[in-house]
Amino acid sequence: AIMKVLPHRPPFLLVDKILELSDTHIVGMKSITMNEPYFAGHFPGQPVMPGVLQIEAMAQAGGVLVLNTVPDPENYLTFFMKIENAKFKNPVVPGDTLIFKMELLSPIRRGICHMQAVAYSRGRVTTEAEMMAQIVRKDQVKV
């Protein structure tokens, strides 16, 4: 169901499952396995999920939240606009289940979504950030 909404595909699809979805929040998860391609180099012998990929996983779940507001999400792309106050508090390693929750900080207007994002693993906060994204119809995107 996630791939019906998001254009991302493995190995860059970083959301395994949506656990909760409302008009104002979303909770997603990603099981972190040793098979993740980035562990080959980050870091050999001591694998740690890169913080930027934790941010990306949260952004992808946020994309599901905002795309859920239109009847035809397959006709839209989500663009990351801004990230503020990102903090990386605890490492995410193979065997962890990363749970990420995004809550709207204000109502979605003109396809713009402003969210507070927090990721958890093993009962601890791993990452938090404020994010802003916008959905745009694919036929209006100039590449």
Q: Where are the language model's segments positioned?
A:
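Short aromatic-glycine motifs in intrinsically disordered, low-complexity regions
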Residues: 1-9, 75
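Catalytic strand-loop segment that frames the active site of acyl-thioester-processing enzymes
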Residues: 10-49, 54
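Conserved positions in beta-strands of structured domains
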Residues: 16-19, 84, 89, 103-105, ...
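Active-site helix/loop of acyl-thioester processing domains in fatty-acid/polyketide metabolism
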Residues: 18, 49-73
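Hydrophobic beta-strand-centered segment that forms part of the acyl-chain substrate-binding groove
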Residues: 62-101, 126, 133-134
